[in-house]
Amino acid sequence: MKLQANIQTEALLEASGIKKELFCQILSLARKYRVERLILFGSRARGDWRAASDIDLAVSGGDFPRFALDIEEAANTLLKFDMVNLNGPVQEELLDQIWKEGIVVYEKI
């Protein structure tokens, strides 16, 4: 199971253009702030990203304000993050986009 998860993670990183170090930082912060689910969406989930494309993340549960602030400050990247708090009001069109193309990259068990 762990090997399969590692293969899936490597495939996700390659398809999304997110470096492994940055991905590990994102997951570490998700655990720190007790995020329940983290969903990658947008161009990096679809695979049509460009080098300067932002990283779109939908966040469910946990301490969203601190997670969002820390990820901007602590993540070792010049890329921008676009974060959506799924526990707050979200436009229906955006929710549809997240459910349609989103990839769950972290889920608290």
Language-model segments: residues:
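Catalytic core of pol beta-like nucleotidyltransferases
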Residues: 1-37, 45-51, 60-109
